[in-house]
């Protein structure tokens, strides 16, 4: 074989090797559970890094940056519909350099692109999908998009970039400048004071969106928003605002009684899809439960309602039984979905109940439970499945049943314990064992607040265990690991 032929053979083989290396999914060796969950997609995902950015610049391809987290229900829906589909993957791989980002691993990237998404669309959420120039400047953004519409978006944006590049660059520059202006807004110095009139004005503007009947903010999906509730509670005490105080009480009671509250294991789901706190998306996030410890602690001090105190113990029980690792640090989240061995997924299976199932487990107690937790049209979700949902107070229910509160609590605890035993036999949703320093710090604060309120050392001891582990494992030479 001549030297020229040998040269071309080696060149072609090496070129094909480089091409095959470039055209493959690169997530298998990542640490993030979320990224690993996408490692078998036909989409040629990169993790964020120089390799992906250089590939986009060298090929003059747009970046497609998809941001989510392992416990996000709609992230998994979009994966199943689009990212596991060969036709969609072909469009994505041909026209884009595709990057997967775990927002919990890279909150810096999540913050930057969320600002851009809100700037471009007026709202945000996850999964967050951004199409950007090879240098990372956004030109299109969206959240969950159904498969057919997703393909249309991909073709339209990539086609626009190829045929009207100057217009795309001009728009990208406007987005870049908008994000820069957002970044220029600096927080006020901590010692800066505001007039009473301004504080009242700002609080009342925020309060406009409160739902006085069902609690929470707005009339659609409901998120607990514990930091906002804490603000309203402090403001109502300082300025004797009874409307705000009543709103906080209503919200916390509705959350406690709602389907957003896991009455069996303790802990709260991230949000509900309705405005009455009934049907949750079933993921559980550490940062929500950590902050809910604080607001229920503060609320118990103000309202002296034992229901609020009981939620402190329920959250503690959840953290202890489901979220604590061997090193005493707290995991980040539990998925909304149950993953079965046959490859199928189903949202909420671990948490919901069928009426016939409850009848077999509870026997004579079924009627009691069906009235308390509304195993009827009020508590119905879908496919003969129910989400436990309380609509009257424990006191009202006791009066209706002709029992005292002590008898009631004893029976409820026995029934919940029985249901917990049965539920533990189910396939469990995936726990993301990622340790996030700031979320563990929030948990310490919530536990300390709970200790101050109850004087129960169980909360302080838990806080000290977490604090000691954080100090040993996540602080090195005064540098804090994220």
Please identify what each model-predicted range represents.
Residues 5, 10, 243-251, 458-465:
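Short alpha-helical "patches" and their helix-cap loops
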Residues 323-332, 458-482:
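Catalytic cores of carbohydrate-active enzymes
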